[in-house]
Amino acid sequence: MLVVKTLLKGSILMATAKKKTTRKKNLVIVESPSKAKTIGKFLGSSYKVIASAGHVRDLPKSKMGIDLENDFEPQYINIRGKGEKIKELKKEAKAAKRVYLATDPDREGEAISWHLAYLLQMDPEEPCRIVFNEITKEAVKNAVKNPRPIEMGLVDAQQARRVLDRLVGYSISPLLWRKVRRGLSAGRVQSAALKIICDRENEIDAFVPEEYWNITSGFSAEKDFEAKLNLYKGEKIKISNEEQSHKIVESLNKNDFVVNNIEAKDRQRKPYAPYTTSSLQQDSANKINFNTKKTMQIAQQLYEGVEIKGVGMIGLVSYIRTDSTRISDEARFAAKEFILDNYGEQYYKGNKYENKRKEAQDAHEGIRPSNVNLVPDDIKESLTTDQYKLYKLIWNRFVASQMTNAQYKYVGADIVNGDYTFRATGSQLIFDGYLKVYKQDRDEDSLLPPLENGQKLDVSYINEEQCFTQPPARFTEASLVKTLEELNIGRPSTYAPIVGTLIDRRYIKRMKKSLCPTELGFTVINLMSEYFEEIVDTRFTAEMEEKLDEVGVEITDWKDILRDFYGPFEKQLEVADKEIEKIEEEVEITDIKCELCGKYMVKKHGRFGDFLACSGYPDCKNTKPIVVSIGVPCPKCGKDLVEKKSRRGKIFYGCSGYPDCDQSYWNKPVNKKCPKCGALLTEKKTKKFEGLVCSNSECDYKEKVEE
């Protein structure tokens, strides 16, 4: 009997153990593996977190993919190459106890969740969607406790944008191929941005500089200072030429300079609001020299999660695609505690920031650190150089936004000489406030010396300076993003790709930091301005963005927007196709002769960049790459090392003496030899290292780039 009971007990234990091992887990689906890794560490063993690797369904690339006869119905297909990923998602979903869709908290993320729900046969009206503004343990666990249905307003807003862009791109691009050159394309928002850049270039070309003169005087008092002439008989003065300037100086030399009016004021400077996507892109360009693409790449890393020593995996910043400056009460309270503990009560103010734009999605916050106590310098060792720079920028801006104003003492003095009035100003910082953490490039304190009304001043010099009015500056990435935001063109997720797209299409080029339109860019925008005026009109583009926002909050039906747009657009297409004549592209002839037939080579544009082709085409089909020397001699033969491209378009560096010399490098060589083995050093940049490494695979020498 005892044996039977023991066997029975063992069977029960085995069955229980088997039941435990087959217990179903909850499945959480996110976009990226790094995000999955971070969230997986927060949720524990009862959850499995996997990544969809972005979109799984989209419009086909091979055709328009919009059923115009069926009220603009999108013809979605599974994205090519995602078959195995979709199989994995279906398998995991089928085996799961419950499925949560945790894609990003914006239109694009909502649309990805909707497509996933379709593929996994989930009901989008069921509470399957979880959202969080920051990837921290508390935020993620709270989101899992509060799932909601998929918001179809946001999905439809994304669908409307996608279909609009497809209608424009897949209709105008073939027209450009036929009339200008194959391979060209036109986008809705990008075309409006290109128009802005081209209009600025036209302003610069049409600008006629005007001469003007400035007169300044130096004075000796308790401290030397300078004043500038700005009034004549109480009116603003304009000095147009040298003769007028000389006459004024002659008059000034006949009279005394007398202090006429002194005003002293206390002025305050307010801290800036926390970053939006746009202001982060602008500041990172101006302060740490990141372009918009790099800014968003690094910001995405900070958002999705970084392994911090002593803390673990954590998303360091809140969601990075936002046009809101609002901050949650919890984040403001955390900032208050930090400021009081580290700087004192006199530095805390607790500012609230209202969104300036009515379209701002108030469900989002401004960009901020997820944990204000993770001070940039304290976690620097856990971050790459670029991550540290950007995190410090975000952290400083947020903490400063909750601090008191900076206070200045301002003094201004009018100095009179006959009918002429000079103005001198000075200021001094008397309380730093938010500047304690958010340093700004400002002139050093320049207080005026003690002055009294009626005081005669000793003149040390009178200086005349010839000047000319300057044309408007070309756009930089930062100033273009600022202008796009001011004109309400695009949204946080669209700013970064715009410049890259226009450069890839060869519509603009970089000149140092400036953006300059190419001849091709002008050709395309002139055609579009004539035949598709609305597409390139900034007001029309801004109004369309507002309509898309209305779709997002379910005020407007997304199909109504498409119907209103496509009718007139279809007629414009017909007119353009009839009236635009074929434009013969100008060919740039070089002084390089073809080694096969002796004719001159011409510069051509290809998929992987510029190359040389024989002008005798099609009789002679000789082509060769354009050689760009990097200024480093080949260690084998002494000839120049040049930049080259592989068949797949990847850049590498090889000897210009090829095929006689086959020396080549994947990393860019520098004109410096390894102190250990004598081989050339090459540039290398990874998440954890930026500097020079030895090109000899058997040598481990490396040196970091000094910051």
Predicted segments with their positions:
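Alpha-helical scaffold elements adjacent to nucleotide-binding pockets in ATP/GTP-utilizing enzyme cores
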Residues: T38-F42, E88, A111-L119, A139-A143, ...
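Intrinsically disordered, low-complexity regulatory segments
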Residues: M1-R162, S171, H246, E354, ...
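Conserved short loop/turn motifs at secondary-structure junctions
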Residues: K24, D104-P105, R181-S185, A264-A273, ...
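Core structural elements
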Residues: R161-S171, S217-F219, R267-S279, Q297-V311, ...
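Basic, low-complexity terminal or inter-domain segments flanking catalytic cores
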Residues: V4-K5, G10-L27, T38, S45-Y47, ...
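Metal- or metallocofactor-binding catalytic centers and their adjacent structured scaffolds
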Residues: I239-A273, Q455
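C-terminal or mid-to-C-terminal helical accessory/interaction module adjacent to the motor/catalytic core
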Residues: I135-F219, A264-K265
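Short helix-coil junctions and helix-kink-helix linkers
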Residues: S279-T292, V481-R491
